Amino acid sequence: MLDQFLSDLKQLLPNDRIYTDELRTLGWGTDASFYRQIPKVVIRSDGEEEISKIIQLCQKHKMPLTFRAAGTSLSGQSCTDSVLIVAGKHWEKYEIGKNQDTIKLQPGIVGARVNEILKPYGRVFPPDPASIGSAMVGGIVINNASGMNCGVHANSDRMMVSARIILTDGTILDTSNEESRRAFRQSHPEFLEKIEALRDKVRANEKLASRIRTKYSIKNVTGLNLRPLVAYDDPFDIIAHSMVGSEGTLAFLSEVTMKTLHDYKYKASAMVYFLTMKESCEAVVAMKKMKAGEDDLTYSAENLVVKSAEMLDYMSLASVDDPVYLQYKKDVDAGKIPDVKPGDYKGLTAILTETKGITHEQLLEKIAKIQDCLSQFKLYIPAEFTEDPAVYGKYWAIRSGIFPSVGGTRPIGTSCLIEDVAFPIESLPEATVKLQKLIADHGYNDACIYGHAFEGNYHFILNQSFADEHEVARYAEMMRDVAKLVVEGYDGSLKAEHGTGRNMAPFVQYEWGDEAYEAMKELKAIFDPDNLLNRGVIFNYDPDCFIKDLKPLPVLDYDFASVPDGGHYLMEPEHSTAKETIEQVKRANKCIECGFCEVNCMSCGLTLSSRMRIAVQREILYLEKTGQNPERAATLRKQYKYYGDQTCAADGLCSTSCPMKINTGELTHLIRQLDMNKNPMGYKVGEFAANHMAGIKSGLRVVLDVAHVAHVTLGPTLMTTVCRTMNKMGMPLWTTAMPKKKRQPKKSDLTQFIIEKSIPHHEGQHSDLKVVYFPSCINQTMGLSKEAPFKHALVDEVIQLMAKAGYEVIFPEGMERMCCGQIWESKGMLDIADRKSAELEAALWKASEQGKYPVLCGQSPCLHRMKKVMKKMKLYEPAEFIMTYLKDRLDFHPTDKPIAIHITCSTRQMGVDKDMIALAKLCSNNVLIPEGVGCCGFAGDRGFTFPELNRYGLRKLKPQIEKNKIEVGYSNSRTCEIGLEANTGIPYLNIVHLVNISTTAKK
């Protein structure tokens, strides 16, 4: 059956979008849940027609199939052991409605990106899950994911306008299009009749209809969404809204149109501390009753004074070292808190409260009402609202930091589980206390409870081991007791936000009752009569399915002792590259495979993502350590070489969106180092290069000169053809963007510039303003490309700019022999990297007169490396240096000509991207910061050896360049600029060139 399915599938799709190998099925089969199933086939789909035909093939061969977008769901709804269809990064189209009150979205666009699109219009995307920075629209809608503000009034179900879906027979239905509806009426009359019959049946049962309305008055995503059956008359509206919360069990969502809401201009927050959890919940109930004016409904779907109230229990506060909690502990131990014994801190509970106003006056009125409401409760300290984003931003950072903080402190090898329940708001004070006690009674003493108290919705985090049957049984018993408390005690929701998945599938009927469950089964049968869509999710008749297929999290335990340490070469050995790399890899054991990293992993979608690399490495090490299945271990290790190692840009941007700040690039560096330990010849080549840098630079200049002559002689077309053929044979790829050689700077350069520009200068006069300039070995070797619009290479431009601003340039001694060490670090020779860094450090220390003068490096990746190991000097790349030292010494004359800038990954990591943008805007009134372009993927030399990585990283750039009619771009890394030019067809240069042509000396 599988072989025939694959045979038919390969007639439909190219092989490079069908994965059946051990490595990619394992990688793509990994999601954020604590379940693991490995798909037999992973399919990367690019369009509706493809999806339609794939679904028909699955029907033909009776192959169960699961759809997936970002894979950030938590309940096991995006994993399968059959066919996995990925609709992610190629499904990102959108269309804003005429009045900006709606937006049409494909499923692969990230939620936070939607808010970026809407921001200029003062609108927001209503659903706001905590994963919005990584979760995609398809998953947000199909799981009915919500968060801190949207509640039940602005979730996907309430905000959906229409949907475009693909049914199990391959039919494409657009519920917003009358022609599509008409065609569907003709082709699927029985389908519509069954929907209408189920609607009427449910409504005729007043008890059931009433129960459905009551259940959805609080957050509830347990089971299929029954609300459409009582909320909408039109069968097409019922079909569309049934998709919300269906978790891929009914159809494929290819497009959705959602309402947008106004974003309030005025906001204020307060962290309110209560002495008991019960009283904090009573305050929430009281605040929930406070109504705002009707004008609020023009901005929000609900007119309440308080817009959100997030509860944080004492363990949550402890996990983030909340300063008020720390003071409370001192007061308790000092006997200052009445009726509380020393050492008993569990009473303190915080409610993070937010209110918003259309006008500032309205905001102040709301704050006064909230303060009046809080006055009836006993607080630990007085509540203080702040309108300062910098202050309340810290409050929300505390709230957002709970999950990573708890997850980051869990014992290695355990899973971090986030459970998700909701109670009716009036039951909150009593139910919350009981939930806290229940969790403690089962031995989860480090668990914390936090969440959306305003919606009666709590998350509790458990550090859970699945290493033995006893631990699994403990978890199962606890979950059954939670179910009993929620369902029998308060008729609440066993899943409020995170989806039913496999985790809560055995409890759906228990929560809803027989009649509602039968209605869900009927709805499922109408859409998916053969039960092929996401089998085992929502509907699962194995009562123990929630404790099966549990994901192992084996320890990443490498031979760290074999990593050579070159830290002793450095002025400060504690900044050793080996030590930092090992620490980062050990931190990777905290990875919970949530997938938040993937939005910033540029190889995600081409080969593997950061999350997948960790998951695969865990499997390899586990198999090798246990001796289980050595053939599979060997296969995974072999396949990992290209997909995991060679196509990892190792840029570290994954850490910027990782809750645990894990840098998977360092894992790649370690793997390369361990591989290099087994390659004596490779190490000898590295040693030779380190000891003969001057000769190698000279040799490279000769190579560049020969390549330039060949380019001129053969022409770009023939030269490109020849070089692409050689690249397929393993040679680095030459492109038309390749630079000419760069000659070394001479003293006469400055003199010649002064003569040309008629700048007053007296021989022998030295400026008090000095800068040590290390161009980097790249900029010492590589000049401009053939098509560059300037005649001076970067080194000359820097000298000229410094003279214009009155700065004297100091070059470090022996510069031709110097390198920052980045090349060796990226190749996995960490000790040599530190040795080269130390040589440069000593030269810069001397040239800067022991740190007296700032140091400028012309290459941002090199500076990033230098900053990691050289802490005693002030180090800058061009943009930050110019904004810090030169801006006030120059007159800027901005051009109206459009330009593009590329923010390199190292620029982002150093936090100087804002300087790059600000500087560009001083020089041009028309600056393009391309959307959807992060790391370019050139990654040192990867753009030469694996050009597909560079092409993929920049796949969204050229259309934007052409649309905006841009003729030149700027950055701050020569190697990145080569790749940018090769993939856009326009020259890219260092931003120093732009500053030079846009400025004159200050008058």
What does each of the following model-derived ranges do?
Residues 16-22, 68, 125-129, 203-223, ...:
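Flexible, glycine/charged-enriched surface loops at secondary-structure junctions
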Residues 26, 73-76, 131-138, 222-225, ...:
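A glycine-rich phosphate-binding loop feature that marks nucleotide/adenosyl-phosphate handling sites
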Residues 137-232, 236-319, 345-352, 607-628, ...:
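Mobile "lid/hinge" segments at catalytic clefts and subdomain interfaces of large enzymes
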Residues 414, 488-494, 500-647, 659, ...:
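Ferredoxin-type iron-sulfur electron-transfer modules and their immediate structural context
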Residues 1-56, 70-101, 249, 253-267, ...:
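N-terminal flexible segment immediately upstream of the FAD-binding catalytic core
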Residues 528, 535, 665-1003:
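Iron-sulfur cluster-binding electron-transfer modules in prokaryotic oxidoreductases
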Residues 256, 261-263, 294-412, 447, ...:
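Terminal amphipathic helices with adjacent charged low-complexity linkers/tails
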Residues 9, 33-65, 83-129, 145-197, ...:
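N-terminal glycine-rich flavin-associated loop
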